């Protein structure tokens, strides 16, 4: 993850911990102007994260077709990675679509719907982390096979995906959970 992404997520986290009201002054009741209807319809995974996942999928697909031990090892990675990505796309990444509005001090009651996803992520964290271990084991086999066959693309992919998983564990998942906690704290305004 780039330093800019890390800094942006860290800034959001700090703002959420002390309260966005302190970071971004607001007037009135603390509620913001309604967002455009399109923005209220769903929680979208940030484009940069979607692009990274798409790139990982494309690279893995190429590796599965590379033949030899590397191709077979890549198929093993795909077998454990694909269902994991489905779950991430269902409930771990979409909450991050609220990073920008929340970091600007904007909160709307409809955002409370994200709690279904963040609660699901919280409950599934042990499984998600266990899947990361399975993915890491498959990546080791891929890296070993690619090294033996002198297929640098396999080695690079294994290293990139391992770093990606570490970023998810250290930044992505905790940020999604933090968004859930923040939205939960703000949702009390909606019940009044």
Model-predicted segments: where are they?
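Small-residue-biased structural context
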Residues: 2-8, 17-192
């Amino acid at each position: 993850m780039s330093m800019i992404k890390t800094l942006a997520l860290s800034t959001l986290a700090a703002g959420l911990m002390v309260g966005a009201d302190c970071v971004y002054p607001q007037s009135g009741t603390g509620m913001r102007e309604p967002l455009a209807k399109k923005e209220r319809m769903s929680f979208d995974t940030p484009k940069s994260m979607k692009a990274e996942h798409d790139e990982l999928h494309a690279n893995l697909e190429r590796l599965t077709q590379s033949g030899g031990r590397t191709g077979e090892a890549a198929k093993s990675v795909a077998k454990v990675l694909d269902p994991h990505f489905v779950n991430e796309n269902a409930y771990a990444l979409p909450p991050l679509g609220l990073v920008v509005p929340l970091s600007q001090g904007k909160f709307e009651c409809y955002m409370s719907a994200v709690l279904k996803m963040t609660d699901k992520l919280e409950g599934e964290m042990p499984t998600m982390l266990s899947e990361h271990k399975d993915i890491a084991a498959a990546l080791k086999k891929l890296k070993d096979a690619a090294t033996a066959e002198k297929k640098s693309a396999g080695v690079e992919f294994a290293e990139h995906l391992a770093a990606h998983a570490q970023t998810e564990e250290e930044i992505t998942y905790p940020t999604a959970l933090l968004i859930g906690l923040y939205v939960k704290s703000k949702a009390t305004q909606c019940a009044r």
